Structures are given as C-alpha cells and as structure tokens.
C-alpha cells in the first residue's frame, strides 16, 4: 500500500516518534547550519502564523517576530528534540549533510524539493521507488510552502545583449511558457541524460508557474515517454489546493536565516533552552544589527 503521510506538524511528530521506536531510524531531520536551518524553518514558522518583517510608513523595516506564534513554532522544534526525540544523533548539520542523512537512511523524513530527488538517488543509492513526496504539513495558521531556489531572474541593469543571451539560455533549459521543436529536443536530451546517470524523470512537472495548456500538454507527453517512477508517490505533493505558496522574506533573508540557525542550534543542543529569551533576542538582534543598518 501507499505510505501514510502526516497531514499536520503534530502528526509528523507522532509518526516520526513511531518510526524511530520501531526501526531505530530517526523519524525526522532538519539542517541547522550555514543559514539552511533558518531557511527550512520558515515553512514551519509561517504555518504557525509568524511574520518576520514589515516595512513601515517611513520606509524602514521592522522585525515583528517577537510573538507568541514564533514561540509556539520554536516550542514545536523543542518538542521534536526533547519530548519526541525524533532527530538523528548529529543535529548540527549543513545542507549537504542533511541530504546525506536521508539517502543513507539515517532519517525517514526531511523537508526538500523534488529537484533534489535525482541527487538523493544517484548519490546515496536509494531505490527511486522508495521515495515518497508529500505536501508540507499543516500548522495552526495553515499549510505553507516556500517558493524559490530555482527561480531565474533578469538583472534590471542588463544590456540588451545580456538579456538576449539569458533568454537563449532559458530556451536551452526549456524554462519558457512555450515549447518549440528545438526546446522539445533539449528537454528530451535532458531526460535521456538524467536516466543515463541513474536519476529520476517524473511523468509531469510537479510544479509549474506557466499557465499555458499547450505547454502543459506537450511537456506531459514528453515526460510521459521517459518517466521512470510511479506517479502515485508524488500525487500528494502535487495537490496544491490548500497550500499557500509564499516567497522568502523581502529583505536580508540570509542574515535572518543565520540568526534563526543559532536559535535552532540552541534548542537542539540544550534541554534548558529558554524559548522566551531566544525569541526576544533573535528579533532584537535582527533589528539592531541588520534592519537598522540598511541604507
């Protein structure tokens, strides 16, 4: 049968605990260094109702996350660590180690995107049919998922020649709202190369910003010819009906992530971590040392 996936963060905690108790494998893991912990944590925090920053009428930015919602989200992490004990032994890890924890079967669940699926299979030797993708668990304020990471943008100060080159590169990737014969050829070549390397080709795009039905039809026809995984393992993930897709915070994201990393590490490594103090100092730090210094 198909795996039973957690619909809420509370269910994730409970399922992760059961997995660890029955198998000895950590039920869940998150990164905690190099700004990756804060980056991943945004999804959890938003679902608890946290907003991190806000632009004031005078144009200045204000840290607004010294709130009960932020404390509740941190408490959830604390409970995962100290109440449910679901994490692997190594809890201070970067993004590379984070992926490794999963593909070496040291953790059953992680937060990642389908663009990492091929790497997980080719690097770690996992059976591609043993990977199941599900949408983000729901929190008290809803179900949030961060967009970004694979976005392509044009620099406003580009020359016309640079913009032309960028468009040609996007066409080479097939990252366009239309599919020409040349783009179709490139997509097919990419699929063949992925399969040759042992990676994953999905039967359809799992997430697309393009609304063109013609493009969708052509893409699904191409991918359908090369697909090498069971689409049922990804159907839950593809149901966006109740998912709020949200971009990263507007300004100084990396500085915010670094501060959140430190908070998460404190929670992971210290049972007597003071949630109230951590929340207050994190917001003050972000305001005083970063937002207030913006030009």
For every predicted segment, state its role.
Residues 4, 50-72, 123-125, 135-144:
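Short, solvent-exposed loop/beta-turn-alpha elements that line the ligand-binding surface or hinge
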Residues 7-14, 89-103:
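Short helix-initiation/N-cap motifs at beta->coil->alpha
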Residues 10-62, 78, 107:
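Extracytoplasmic/periplasmic solute-binding protein
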Residues 13-18, 59-91, 132, 136:
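Glycine-centered hinge/linker elements that transmit conformational signals in sensory
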Residues 21-34, 176-185, 288-295:
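Bilobed periplasmic-binding protein-like "clamshell/Venus-flytrap" ligand-binding domains
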Residues 23-26, 104-113, 129:
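Alpha-to-beta junction loops
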Residues 95, 112-120, 150:
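Beta->alpha turn/N-cap motifs
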């Amino acid at each position: 049968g198909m795996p039973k996936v957690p619909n809420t963060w509370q269910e994730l905690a409970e399922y992760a605990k059961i997995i660890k108790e029955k198998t000895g494998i950590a039920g869940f893991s998150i990164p905690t260094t190099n700004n990756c912990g804060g980056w991943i944590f945004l999804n959890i925090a938003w679902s608890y109702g946290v907003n991190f920053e806000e632009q004031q009428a005078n144009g200045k930015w204000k840290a607004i996350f010294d709130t009960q919602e932020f404390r509740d989200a941190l408490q959830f992490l604390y409970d995962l660590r100290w109440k449910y004990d679901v994490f692997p032994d190594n809890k201070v890890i970067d993004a590379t180690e984070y992926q490794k924890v999963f593909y070496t079967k040291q953790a059953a669940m992680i937060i990642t995107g389908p663009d990492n699926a091929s790497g997980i299979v080719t690097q770690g030797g996992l059976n591609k049919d043993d990977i199941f993708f599900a949408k983000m668990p729901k929190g008290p304020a809803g179900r949030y998922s961060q967009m970004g990471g694979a976005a392509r943008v044009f620099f406003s100060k580009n020359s016309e020649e640079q913009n032309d080159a960028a468009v040609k590169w996007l066409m080479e990737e097939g990252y366009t709202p239309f599919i020409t014969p040349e783009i179709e050829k490139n997509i097919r070549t990419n699929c063949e190369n992925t399969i040759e390397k042992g990676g994953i080709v999905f039967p359809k795009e799992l997430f697309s910003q393009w609304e063109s039905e013609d493009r969708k039809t052509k893409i699904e026809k191409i991918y359908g010819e090369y697909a090498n995984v069971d689409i049922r393992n990804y159907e839950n993930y593809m149901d966006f009906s109740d998912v709020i897709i949200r971009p990263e915070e507007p300004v100084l994201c990396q500085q915010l992530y670094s501060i959140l990393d430190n908070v998460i590490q404190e929670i992971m490594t210290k049972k007597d971590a003071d949630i109230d103090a951590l929340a207050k100092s994190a917001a003050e730090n972000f305001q005083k040392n970063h937002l207030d210094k913006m030009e």
